[in-house]
């Protein structure tokens, strides 16, 4: 099939015809979170005829195949232009257009005795976005101290092993490796990737990143004392215990942070990367089910990042995955017979030094 592209200068100018013989490459990076996505367009400016874009110009990029049609990848606001030579060329760099405006303005705000869902609703409302929060978490107190909504929500999401992003007019806070959404905000099902779909792949494990559990401290409002909270990993009892060096305001908050740190450690114990012919349906945070590579590698993998590369030589999609539940079970080794820890973790007394 023949790869094709479309670049539109919003609101309604199609630049594709004038760029057909000048396009050197399109590179689009898609990562989990609010600040990682990026567009790079390299153009042949051999005669100096390519005009510099206006400040704040927005481009809509679509990729696809002549035989099956185009797929919209996203809208980007150009915030960097680079010219070089010889040979003379121009590179345009941009970020998702949804990230512009008030969401980058610094603010001061505080929340008490609420939920993460309510915080997301407040932030979405003042940025004229629709809130979607799939993380259930109680909030004792949160302080936004001269931070942008973008930075603040990214920080809070990480504490709950979640990601925050804006797509299709929606402010999304979703569990890591959980429910991916398309550019229009629709939930995406697990995508099956067979060995014959893949051009090349690489799998690696790292037991040094395994954790036997995570401990932290919390304040007990009833006793006024500090307690040490441990969230163990029954599948890795011999691995070292990690520590979150911040005293939480409650056992629930401490348990949530410890669980988030434990899940992050689990994802880093195995990685899978692969490249395949260009596909627009592969996006960060989507879960792929890989089949036909080999036992121990096959299974469900949450996508950490995707790079779409389009040039005169073709269109290629590069994918990086972190360990999902399937890989954690396979790499954990022999079980110890311990039951899964429920609730917010074990309270250890007296609190030790962290």
Regions found by a protein language model. Name each.
Residues 1-99:
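Assembly/oligomerization scaffold segments
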Residues 6, 89, 95-99, 133-198:
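Short beta-strand-centered interaction patches in the first periplasmic/extracellular domains
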Residues 22, 26-54, 197-354:
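An acidic/polar, Gly/Ser/Thr-rich interaction patch typically located in mid-to-C-terminal regions
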Residues 40-42, 94, 107-132, 144-167, ...:
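Amphipathic, non-transmembrane alpha-helical segments in extracytoplasmic/periplasmic proteins
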Residues 63-65, 175, 286, 292:
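Conserved "cap/hinge" positions at secondary-structure junctions
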Residues 75, 117-120, 150-154, 213-214, ...:
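Extracytoplasmic/secreted envelope proteins and their assembly/folding machinery
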